[in-house]
């Protein structure tokens, strides 16, 4: 076992929370910072595409004893259901009998992971904006605005898990010989919803990932625990049949 360290994780998303649990279980003091409010106390309006959890993700959870906790809020998905037109549906199983992936609400999973991390002893600091990090000392700087007054917090290690507009990566990019590239696809998405039947049951097979492929655009649907389906329409930003 390593000597206990004081560690900061910037970002309370799925990666940040799981990393924090791993570090805490190894005996470290772990603080998680996030500029957003506590996701458990607000209506979730972030990225809403359902998350599909495969065997690799299950293993990552199993290694810290959390797989059953998380799978309890998911729906097993054993196959793709390809809706090619009319009433034709082609089924493609993901593996042998019993081999499945899991459909989970991203927001519900994130809330669960924060709960599990807190239960493990991780401390969270929500609404705290990290603007800078000293890459040599791991000291982080927090303040209300980028040009305002900052307070510093000293750590032995700081991990960046703060997403697409990461302040940690921003600081790393200013180092010599640091390569970074960013590309944008000409594909966007919109969330749609298939509500549950009046009795709360699913309108489609809940254990399938439903796909309606139509050339350069497609619709997919994954089941939720409440009987609904979260659907995602993928289309080009421009041109015919686009957003």
Segments from the language model and where they lie:
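Conserved Rossmann-like nucleotide-cofactor binding loop
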Residues: 15, 38, 165
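Conserved FAD-binding catalytic core of PHBH/FMO-like flavoproteins
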Residues: 115, 131-132, 137-243
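Glycine-rich FAD pyrophosphate-binding loop
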Residues: 24-46
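Short phosphate-binding/catalytic loops that engage adenosine nucleotides
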Residues: 28, 66, 122
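N-terminal Rossmann-like FAD-binding beta1-loop-alpha1 element of flavoenzymes
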Residues: 5-32
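A structural signal for isolated positions on well-ordered beta-strands in alpha/beta enzyme cores
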Residues: 8, 31, 123, 230-232
């Amino acid at each position: 076992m390593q000597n206990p360290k004081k560690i900061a994780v910037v970002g309370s998303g799925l990666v940040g929370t799981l990393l924090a649990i791993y570090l805490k279980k190894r005996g470290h003091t772990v603080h998680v910072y996030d500029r957003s409010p506590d996701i458990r106390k607000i209506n979730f309006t972030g990225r809403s595409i359902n998350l599909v959890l495969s065997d690799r993700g299950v293993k990552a959870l199993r290694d810290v004893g959390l797989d059953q906790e998380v799978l309890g809020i998911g729906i097993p998905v054993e196959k793709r259901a390809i809706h090619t037109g009319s009433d034709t549906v082609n089924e493609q199983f993901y593996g042998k009998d019993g081999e499945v992936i899991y459909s989970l609400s991203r927001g519900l999973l994130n809330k669960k992971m924060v709960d599990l991390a807190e239960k493990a002893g991780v401390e969270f600091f929500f609404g705290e904006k990290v603007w800078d990090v000293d890459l040599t000392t791991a000291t982080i700087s927090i303040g209300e605005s980028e040009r305002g007054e900052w307070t510093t917090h000293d750590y032995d290690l700081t991990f960046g898990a703060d997403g697409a507009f990461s302040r940690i990566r921003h600081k790393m990019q200013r180092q010599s010989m640091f390569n970074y590239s960013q590309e944008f696809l000409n594909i966007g998405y919109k969330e749609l919803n298939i509500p549950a039947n009046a009795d709360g049951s699913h309108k489609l097979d809940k254990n399938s990932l439903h796909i309606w492929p139509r050339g350069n655009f497609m619709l997919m649907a994954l089941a939720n625990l409440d009987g609904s389906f979260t659907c995602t329409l993928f289309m080009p930003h421009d041109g015919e049949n686009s957003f």
